[in-house]
């Protein structure tokens, strides 16, 4: 019989060799719990993230814009489903995760608790929020847990389309009237700082980051990813003609990275604790959708039961 110590050594050897941990492999309980926390939060974020953009489907300025936005929101639904399925391989059920979300016990990305008052917000979300997601998620394609890593490959490909869509919306607005240019700039001003917060608190204040990196769930720290994101944004902002709302954003030759103003982490914590502008609305909307869709789940379950009966009788 293999002892727990032997299993731990085998697990550590796989991590050290940059190999993949699969669902049937032995894994420490803390590793499993850490993955459930991160992956379920990621799945919840994709599902809740449909709401800010879904609000604009009926108000998009053209049929083409509407079709593209619908496709994007459908992608987000698919991402959530991939991730829920991947998380289920760790021993938690879809119902448990959904219950945690609609009861307000589960966390999701704080960025989706901000309102989207103008069409330009669709551009800012695509460029900034999806851009931050790409920087955060591409390294997850090399995550040590196989189902998560494989799900991320497809998700990242689709996120790159979302980021380009947002960039193109802002570019079109910046080539328009003065009012359209101002609308685009205002949206960038609204979403810039929340998008930087998406990477999580500073490394010295992040309770989970170091352990996730040791297990190779994460490959880079929060601050490293944030710096990488800012370095990507600066030249893109120049192409767009928008100004990033940080007067202290300057290149540092010595550190070879950008110096920036301090982030308002008090705002981040307030939103994370459920006191953001749209927290209550987002959860209530998700709860309503879940309750309204109960008949669909019941019908699907009954159909599956009858099909199973037919197969057994055949």
What are the language-model segments listed below?
Residues 1-10, 72-100, 167-170:
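Conserved alpha-helical segments that form or flank metal/cofactor-binding pockets of metalloenzymes
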Residues 182-314:
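Extended, helix-rich structural scaffolds rather than catalytic motifs
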Residues 20-40, 100-126, 143, 176-180, ...:
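Acidic/His metal-coordination segments adjacent to aromatic residues that form catalytic metal sites
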Residues 31-42, 60-79, 122, 147-159, ...:
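Alpha-helical scaffold segments that form or flank carboxylate-/histidine-based iron centers
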Residues 1-31, 56, 292-314:
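Extreme N-terminal leader/anchor segments
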Residues 143-194:
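Glycine- and acidic-residue-rich phosphate-binding/metal-coordinating active-site segment common to enzymes
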Residues 114-165:
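Internal, conserved structured core segments that host functional sites
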Residues 25-31, 49-71, 133-148:
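Helix-loop segments that flank and shape redox-cofactor active sites
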């Amino acid at each position: 019989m293999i002892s727990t110590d032997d299993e731990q050594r085998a697990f550590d050897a796989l991590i050290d060799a940059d190999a993949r941990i699969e669902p049937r492999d032995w894994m420490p309980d803390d590793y499993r719990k850490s993955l459930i926390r991160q992956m379920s939060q990621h799945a919840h974020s994709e599902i809740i993230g449909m709401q800010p953009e879904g609000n604009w489907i009926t108000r998009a300025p053209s049929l083409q814009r509407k079709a593209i936005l619908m496709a994007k929101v459908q992608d987000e639904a698919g991402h959530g489903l991939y991730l829920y399925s991947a998380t289920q391989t760790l021993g938690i059920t879809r119902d448990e995760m959904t219950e945690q979300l609609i009861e307000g016990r589960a966390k999701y990305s704080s960025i989706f608790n901000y309102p989207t008052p103008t069409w330009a917000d669709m551009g800012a979300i695509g460029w900034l929020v999806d851009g931050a997601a790409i920087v955060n998620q591409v390294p997850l394609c090399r995550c040590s847990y196989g189902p998560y890593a494989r799900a991320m490959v497809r998700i990242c490909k689709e996120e790159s389309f979302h980021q380009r869509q947002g960039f193109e919306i802002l570019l079109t607005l910046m080539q328009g009237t003065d009012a359209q240019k101002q609308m685009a700039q205002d949206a960038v001003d609204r979403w810039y700082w929340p998008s930087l917060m998406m990477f999580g608190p500073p490394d010295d204040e992040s309770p989970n980051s170091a352990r996730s990196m040791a297990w190779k769930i994460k490959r880079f720290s929060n601050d490293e990813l944030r710096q990488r994101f800012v370095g990507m944004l600066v030249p893109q902002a120049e192409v767009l003609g928008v100004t990033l709302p940080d007067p202290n954003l300057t290149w540092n030759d010595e550190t070879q990275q950008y110096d920036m103003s301090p982030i308002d982490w008090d705002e981040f914590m307030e939103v994370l604790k459920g006191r953001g502008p749209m927290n209550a609305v987002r959860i209530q909307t998700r709860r309503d959708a879940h309750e309204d869709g109960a008949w669909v789940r019941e019908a699907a379950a009954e159909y599956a039961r009858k099909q199973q009966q037919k197969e057994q009788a055949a």
